[in-house]
């Protein structure tokens, strides 16, 4: 049997020069123009993570709103451009920028770095699938989101509706193949609650995941993957109602939103410290 040969894009790090004055193109899916855009910057957690990293650490950039992942060098969004050169993957981009613009994690102890890495793994490889489940697999999540984004899939021209249906079917299959869609919704809700309750414990009474005085790259990850659970209740009401009872993670979402996303509104009342 012949195996499919998948293309592999190598990031051309050697072809870009970035310094403090460089304006980097940040290509991402944005929330679009709708009621939810006042509460979240994007429904893509990797995009929110990268944009938050850029804002937290003052990296000059201009946002480019992409409509399809096909334009990404690995067919994934987000990616960055410096001139015509493209670098992909939020994690690889952050790693590279740390080497050329300074590393906001340099002061962390090995144990803190290890903890940050494990939290990142849980969010990007576990909680992410729950996000996809609500965006694509669940009828209620899909109906809610497509209503907000395009005013309901049934109002669209037939060919666009068909393209959306195909995309949804593709992501539903991925959710089933990965395994998340083999759990009941009650089990999925429980999994999401446990991930975020664990982060709440780890933040404790600090301002950020790993300290009180300044954020690290891990805070951009936490914000990217948990913001919508706090801000967009109608996608997943049971999860949102639970996470809004978490005092430390809720305070964290409020801190990051007010400090780095002054244009956004908070959809919930954070607990007072
Ligand atoms: N590891 C990548 C993941 C990016 C990713 O999965 N992006 C999603 C949007 S949230 C995407 O482009 N999906 C399109 C697809 O998989 O077809 C990163 O950190 O940038």
Predicted features along the sequence, with ranges:
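Catalytic cores of nucleic-acid editing and processing enzymes
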Residues: 118, 122, 166-170, 184, ...
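Generic detection of long, well-ordered alpha-helical segments
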Residues: 44, 87, 106-113, 182-189, ...
